Amino acid sequence: MKPTMMSNWPGFINRFVRQVRHPLDFRRPYRITGFPDNLSPLGYFGQTKQYARAAQEPYLVTVVQGRSKKPCSPRERANRRFGEDSWFVSSTPRAEVLGVADGVGGWRDMGVDAGRFAKELMGCCCGRSEQEDFDGRNPRSLLVSSYQELKDRDDPVVGSSTACVVAMHRRDLTLYTANLGDSGFMVLRNGRVMHRSEEQTHDFNTPFQLTVAPSHKLDSVHCDGPEKAAVSRHPLAPGDLVLLATDGLFDNLPESMLLEMLRKFHGVRDEKELQDAANQVVEKARELSMNASFPSPFAVKARANNISYSGGGKPDDITLILASVEVPKVHR
């Protein structure tokens, strides 16, 4: 953010706090910005995928799908953004790393691209996951170092976002996770939930969030450090499905419906077939988000928190990463 924007800060702060902390702060669309060329998903990622398969190491068959709340340029997938959501997928000889982040929309009222922070955070995590010193067992370290980088830049990246980063370590076939806020992950096996991350929230629809803001205003906004990210580890088995998503999916698609849609895809190796599954899930979530009478998970939570909400889905950006665990026979 340029210094001239900071000079307008006092006039916006009270309105901004209401936007960020209000329980019905629906996130809004974004403007397209470029993604660093050196983080192209077709470069290092594709090369290490080939390495893993040639070396007969465990790997993930991974697909991505998403929908912005409002129509946006078709370039958004290349920019790894769906509205104010962002994502990354990284593959190294040690691990496969996946991440999603959801930018907090309240920043838009201050003239800030609410999705930029999420995009830059995921870009940093992607780059750092491919460095030699990342062993694939501590995804929270990616959040710590990436968050610090955004804060330390000469032109700090101002904003907030949730973050969920997971890594499948090839040698021990274990999923290591770090989750902050209300994005999250699931591990599915034979149509059952083996594990699902828990939401971290201050209040209803006010998730934990990484934030970069002027130091004298930190007390006025929610600012949760990456050390608050919940970490866990989960043994994986061949055919397991690993799912990462932003709240645009979880707030609109009931778990029972999600499980039913994905039940037949256990053990799927074909990328096109898995992509079809992701497409169906995202399209169903988008459809339900526009249904004013559907008892969505968001509407159910609103009533449980005595929040006045007319019911139905929650229009929002939706991002989904869906991966199937593939283990060559030599490792079974």
Curated annotation (Swiss-Prot):
- Enzyme Commission code(s) on record: 3.1.3.16
Specify the domain of life of the species encoding this protein. Eukaryota
Residues bound to Mn(2+) 1 are 102-103
Tell me which Pfam families the record gives.
PP2C_2 (PF13672)
| Amino-acid positions noted as binding Mn(2+) 2 in the UniProt annotation, renumbered to this chain | 102, 247
Requisite cofactors: Mg(2+); Mn(2+)
Give the EC class as a word: hydrolase
**Annotated GO CC locations:** mitochondrion
| Reaction equation(s) it catalyzes | O-phospho-L-seryl-[protein] + H2O = L-seryl-[protein] + phosphate; O-phospho-L-threonyl-[protein] + H2O = L-threonyl-[protein] + phosphate
| Record carries keyword Protein transport | no
Q: Which GO terms describe its biological process?
A: dephosphorylation
The UniProt family comment states:
Belongs to the PP2C family.
Protein known as: Protein phosphatase PTC7 homolog fig
